[in-house]
Amino acid sequence: TPSRSAEFFFGALVHQTIEDIHRWAMDGKADKLDESEIQNLFHLNFQNLLKRGLRPIGPKQREEAFVQVMNYFKQNRSEFSRIIETEVDVSVEKDNYILIGKVDLLLGGDGKLELLDFKSQPRPAEYDDRIFSYYRQLCTYAHILETRDGRLPERLMVYWTAEPKKEDALMIFPYERNVVDEAGAHFDKVVSQIQN
């Protein structure tokens, strides 16, 4: 549908531009980033999404997406030195399936590991079902990272880029093993239902 297509385009544009900012930071070029350079990255991502045949967003949505990117950049620039990795592929092999995901950002500092996922939408109300769903996803990714690398993330975070202020945008969760176990049981059940 057109609205879902626009929603995907918007989210991908914000997400890919923030990823580019992180890559610049990882390459030691964060100090060269300014609004003009970010506008160039944003424009390139817009063009690349068009080339993929996606239906573009209108000028108002495009401006809103750029504002989200710039708000994130301005309020989180001091964190860029803590970036360990961006767009981290994670997977775990189970008996009957392989669970695959992608972590948007790994941060570190003082020997601690933090996992962050971006959502290009407003922060939902506290008891919205999506929050637990995202939390379960983050716990699963944390478990995969612990299994793969032997390092357990201490903080799991969601960053709602549509929120203008960092304190509203950043949602922090603890890692809880029982949530991982519940998520694993949920995936096992879903796979079993699909196979049968």
Residue ranges and their predicted role:
Residues 1, 16-18, 48, 117-122, ...:
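Short acidic (Asp/Glu) and glycine-rich catalytic loops that position anionic groups and cofactors
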Residues 1-9:
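C-terminal, charged and often intrinsically disordered regions of DNA end-processing helicases
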Residues 8, 131-136, 177, 181:
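Short, conserved loop/turn and helix-capping segments at secondary-structure boundaries
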Residues 11-15, 65, 105, 141, ...:
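A residue-level signal for conserved active-site and pocket-lining positions in enzyme catalytic cores
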Residues 17-87, 93:
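A non-catalytic, helix-rich entry segment at domain boundaries
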Residues 18-26, 73, 120-123, 146-150, ...:
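Hydrophobic/aromatic-lined pockets within catalytic cores
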Residues 33, 143-196:
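Metal-dependent nuclease catalytic regions and adjoining charged, substrate-binding loops involved
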Residues 85-143:
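Non-catalytic protein-protein interaction segments used by genome-maintenance enzymes to assemble
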